[in-house]
Amino acid sequence: MSMFNKIVKEFQWGQHTVRMETGEIARQAGGAVLVDVEDTVVLATVVAAKNPKPGQDFFPLTVDYIEKTYAAGKIPGGFFKREGRPSENETLTSRLIDRPLRPLFPEGFYNDVQVVIHVVSLNPEVPADIPALIGASAALAVSGIPFNGPVGAARVGYKDGQYLLNPTRSQLATSDLDLVVAGTERAVLMVESEANQLSEDVMLGAVVYGHEQMQIAINAIHELVREGGKPEWDWAPAAKNEPLIAKVTEVALPLLQEAYQLRQKSARSQKLKEVNANVAAALAAAGVEADKVEVGNIMFDLEAKIVRGQVLAGEPRIDGRDTRTVRPIEIRSSVLPRAHGSALFTRGETQALVVATLGTKSDEQIIDALAGEYRDRFMLHYNMPPFATGETGRVGSPKRREIGHGRLAKRALIPVLPKDDEFAYTIRLVSEITESNGSSSMASVCGGCLALMDAGVPVKAHVAGVAMGLILEGNKFAVLTDILGDEDHLGDMDFKVAGTDNGITALQMDIKVQGITKEIMQVALAQAREGRLHILHKMQEAMGHARTELSAHAPRMITMKIHPDKIREVIGKGGSTIQALTKETGTTIDIQEDGTITIASTSTDGMAEAKRRIEGITAEAEVGKIYAGTVLKLLDFGAIVNILPGKDGLLHISEIVNERVKDIKDWLKEGQQVRVKLIQADEKGRLRLSLKAALTEEGGSISPINAGEAAAPAAPAEGSEQQ
């Protein structure tokens, strides 16, 4: 009899067979599920603390998605040969899993929960993020931890008017859409997507299609729980302290209503601090001993009630706008004189300074991904220092949020970038958030597009982004355009839409409640389009098209092609030739395996010289041509003459002049410049040269050395070549 109570569920999901099992591996974890999708295998585990930490005032959920290099049959690089800090993909996937799980934990549950997903086997054609999300959901479901799941997920592609369920990497390469949707049986909770300027209807259809198709995975998790799930925790939220709620409401409600009439964020924030201090003082005076966490939760509920009530009643929003108005926009380009391109995009109290830098092929980011190494020619880095919100805090390496926001902005801009053969530069955008009050990632999209245009990148169209919010109470709802930070915090849905005049390029949606219908999403997307077009109009007014000239400080590039067999001649022994070339001409030279050479420099003369020298190095000697050569070495029977870089030939003593030559030193010396004709090249590459043939053809003459230096030949014949 086996020591394991192993439960296995298998189902067909589109073109893939999915296998889920629990009960054999990681049995001491709260829940553990192994998910296998066509040889991509993930182990998802969850552990929760039995009690919350004292004074805990938020839900401490941690999700760690970890790719093991052995999953792809690799050994890690570096000195230690171990997996190191999380890659960008691991960080983004951790966030992708966290977002749909977090809203499903019950209110008041403050126990530490850690979800860890290991990728232990990888089929390069099957991305591991969807199996990881399903595995995390299943592990939570079988653990018995308080969780209102399970969650399902699906990836949706779009090609030739048809939706694709969980497309392979090869299919994604030609798809117009890469959309991940996650949700429960009843509702969509999360959407993350990149699209090639698709319409709102196509995007909404993809969300609905994905939600329908994920139900088979949700049903399989239910079956797994029925057969192998652990008992549910005996947990209930703490009973509400009604006397405390009444006291806090009595003191705080009128003051909070005053605070939310203040339109300036700084003034409102200061007023809210005063309200909190007044509440604490009133409770102390009344002799009420209250937990700070409990009071904070009551205050949050009161703030949400005020803000949401105002919007649903048709009253002005926190900053005085109606539900459809975008905040005032100011745009300035070429902000930084030495940068290749820059733009300052300000929308209300959110501001992004975005800077574009152009580089060469050698500046591309080399990413050693689990599925294989690849190069990325477009980078977008998002930074939000604490001063952007008027706070002090840590400054250093980017946090998960910054990596996620940068990735969203990058997704939005990728579809409008020129192809590599149209614009060979490597591009780096950096978005410095200098002020933040909501929607800083979408400000990065707008500022990023303008910075690219300022740098002279021929983007296909302007791209703008807008953050939308939603407030839902029963059958009443309101969609908010261009939300503030407080509206994001107090609302039920935060979704960001970026795109051009023609369609959507990126969509990110996070829904905190169940009950958001297709119709509500349809209204929200239509209103988002209205806001996006308004912002696009402002951007087009500020900068109608990309600059036709690059910045004087940006490198120029020329591209040339050589035969791949000649690459080693250009590189030279130990890189000596190319190192000398780059140093002497002040250029950067990149050579591809197919023989494509890119020469970059801020000096056009330097580029021209580098190109001329490479052409000389790779030139083929042609029989019948006359060359300007240099005598390298004298022999008894002739001389070795260099006619091209790396191309030496024999000038036989009989080919110097028509008369008999007794001693070659009477006619030639080492270092002497001579005009010679290539008269023969054999299959081994040996060259035979003739000085007398060149003299005859060009009408020149030569005298013995003791009678003076060689006479200058006549003008070269047409078609001859001179180094």
From Swiss-Prot:
Locations listed in the record: Cytoplasm
What are the residue boundaries of the S1 motif domain, all occurrences included? 624-692
Alphabetical GO biological process terms = mRNA catabolic process; RNA processing
Q: Which residues are involved in binding Mg(2+)?
A: 488, 494
Q: Name one GO molecular function term.
A: magnesium ion binding
Which residues belong to any copy of the KH domain? 555-614
Q: Please verify whether the record's keywords include Disulfide bond.
A: no
Question: Transferase among the record's keywords?
Answer: yes
Ranges of Low complexity compositional bias? 707-723
The primary site where this protein sits is cytoplasm
Which SUPFAM superfamilies does the UniProt record give?
Eukaryotic type KH-domain (KH-domain type I) (SSF54791), Nucleic acid-binding proteins (SSF50249), Polynucleotide phosphorylase/guanosine pentaphosphate synthase (PNPase/GPSI), domain 3 (SSF46915), Ribonuclease PH domain 2-like (SSF55666), Ribosomal protein S5 domain 2-like (SSF54211)
Q: What reaction does this catalyse?
A: RNA(n+1) + phosphate = RNA(n) + a ribonucleoside 5'-diphosphate
Superkingdom assignment: Bacteria
GO cellular-component terms in the record? cytosol
What Gene3D superfamilies does the entry give?
GHMP Kinase, N-terminal domain, K Homology domain, type 1, Nucleic acid-binding proteins
Q: Which Pfam families match?
A: KH_1, PNPase, RNase_PH, RNase_PH_C, S1
Report the EC number(s), separated by commas if there are several: 2.7.7.8
Q: Which cofactor does it need?
A: Mg(2+)
The alphabetized UniProt keywords are: Cytoplasm, Magnesium, Metal-binding, Nucleotidyltransferase, RNA-binding, Transferase
Its function, per the record, reads: Involved in mRNA degradation. Catalyzes the phosphorolysis of single-stranded polyribonucleotides processively in the 3'- to 5'-direction.
PANTHER family, alphabetized = POLYRIBONUCLEOTIDE NUCLEOTIDYLTRANSFERASE, POLYRIBONUCLEOTIDE NUCLEOTIDYLTRANSFERASE 1, MITOCHONDRIAL
Q: Which family does it belong to?
A: Belongs to the polyribonucleotide nucleotidyltransferase family.
HAMAP family in the cross-refs:
PNPase
Q: What is this protein called?
A: Polyribonucleotide nucleotidyltransferase
Instruction: Please tell me the species this chain comes from.
Output: Cupriavidus necator (strain ATCC 17699 / DSM 428 / KCTC 22496 / NCIMB 10442 / H16 / Stanier 337)
